[in-house]
Amino acid sequence: MKQTVYIASPESQQIHVWNLNHEGVLTLTQVVDVPGQVQPMVVSPDKRYLYVGVRPEFRVLAYRIAPDDGALTFAAESALPGSPTHISTDHHGQFVFVGSYNAGNVSVTRLEDGLPVGVVDVVEGLDGCHSANISPDNRTLWVPALKQDRICLFTVSDDGHLVAQEPAEVTTVEGAGPRHMVFHPNEQYAYCVNELNSSVDVWELKDPHGNIECVQTLDMMPENFSDTRWAADIHITPDGRHLYACDRTASLITVFSVSEDGSVLSKEGFQPTETQQRGFNVDHSGKYLIAAGQKSHHISVYEIVGEQGLLHEKGRYAVGQGPMWVVVNAH
């Protein structure tokens, strides 16, 4: 398995393309100059395209991925109804979902042969919309509205329209600020990192289209932490055993172990990392974690080790200015 790591740096308007080998070593293979401040990125389900959101001219760009080395070639673009904060796709590669924090909306862009061709639906009134996350069964879109302390739930129709489910939302504790999410591989649990109180909620999907319950909330910060809380990102290993979340103020990654059924998280430790770590990701083997420092302009690679899933630094690399997004593609 070959793996390519893509790093989005909006301040220098670049995507750095790296090869990740089996020993956790990165080799720079390409630097792409992007026509705008590039932030969120996602790889298409068939691994043929990288979709990126840019500002200040709000667009989604599609880059064709070379199958041999992961190199990028521009392919197409489509306008968006707001500044892109988060980007994702459905599991069949039919639609791109874009959450916009500033516009307070989530949009659906249709794909034809992998290329974006236009927005087919927009839902407004999502104050602080910070991500759009498709459920494992490809039916429900989870959309955290950070400023409203709620996660809105939409059914995705065959033509890409979003229909509010019943119930139409789940709510967090007041002032939590739900932000980013991941799903357990067993499809029975979802995990949401809350930006404003730096906590992680565990949601049990008893019925993913209606009966959803928060079964655990864990503080992700050290006991003696007294500064402003400012959580950012969350990811889980492919085997579902280890979960990670980061806080930008502390420049810290919190390490969690996950119970066998996915229902319980346990804090295992803390890893100091790049300054104001905004984004990170786990590779497809579950052996490495790559973290980007928005203020350090560097990325670090960590090996995931032991039963606890603790992080051991393997290497550190300079990238563009203000790196914010990390995507790993296996090919």
From Swiss-Prot:
GO molecular function, one term: 6-phosphogluconolactonase activity
Protein keywords: Acetylation, Carbohydrate metabolism, Glucose metabolism, Hydrolase
UniProt KW Thylakoid keyword: no
Pathway noted in the entry: Carbohydrate degradation; pentose phosphate pathway; D-ribulose 5-phosphate from D-glucose 6-phosphate (oxidative stage): step 2/3
Catalytic activity reported: 6-phospho-D-glucono-1,5-lactone + H2O = 6-phospho-D-gluconate + H(+)
Record has Acetylation as a keyword: yes
Gene3D superfamilies on file: YVTN repeat-like/Quinoprotein amine dehydrogenase
GO annotations of cellular component type: cytosol
Family: Belongs to the cycloisomerase 2 family.
PANTHER family the record matches: 6-PHOSPHOGLUCONOLACTONASE, 6-PHOSPHOGLUCONOLACTONASE-RELATED
Name the UniProt record assigns to this protein: 6-phosphogluconolactonase
Encoding gene (name): pgl
